[in-house]
Design a protein with these regions (language model features):
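Vicinal oxygen chelate
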Residues: 2-14, 32-33, 40-42, 49-53, 57-82, 101-106, ...
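Short, solvent-exposed loop/turn segments that connect beta-strands within catalytic domains
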Residues: 45-48, 61-62
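Short alpha-helical
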Residues: 18, 48, 77
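Amphipathic alpha-helical segments
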Residues: 15-30, 82-84
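Intrinsically disordered, low-complexity boundary segments flanking structured domains
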Residues: 27, 36-42, 54-57, 74-75
Length: 121
């Protein structure tokens, strides 16, 4: 029998409830569970990994070693939508490599993520 694993994405943050508001709108997710130290968001439809926002006492320091990519068809439209929700654009212009295009951004607590056209598999 093969090994089966699933992935839950966890972001450390200062204020889970506040940050959940941003990610709920950014990903079109819904609330599953929320308290002062943890917010769990799940997809409204379909199959995707849940996102857990976990309160930690230490402030963010340095660049994330791992980040989320939000894959869309229209990068600029999505960047503008996310900026209206409180995201910040890190780079000017669009980066590209191997047919993939992306813009680096950060959420309201400075967690980095990308808006990308995705990789064609």
């Amino acid at each position: 029998m093969g090994h089966k694993a699933t992935v839950e994405l966890v972001l450390d943050c200062e204020e889970p409830k506040r940050l959940a508001k941003f990610w709920r709108e950014a990903l079109d997710y819904r609330d599953y569970y929320t308290d002062a130290n943890l917010a769990v968001l799940v997809p409204k439809e379909g199959i995707a990994s849940p996102l857990l926002l976990q309160a930690v006492p230490e402030p963010k320091a340095g660049k994330n070693r791992m980040h989320l990519d939000i894959v869309v068809d229209d990068i600029e439209a999505e960047v503008h939508r996310l900026q209206a929700l409180g995201a910040r654009r890190i780079d000017e212009g669009v980066q590209s490599f191997g047919g993939t295009r992306w813009v680096r951004m950060s959420d309201p607590e400075r967690n980095e993520f990308c808006v990308s056209t995705g990789i064609e598999w």
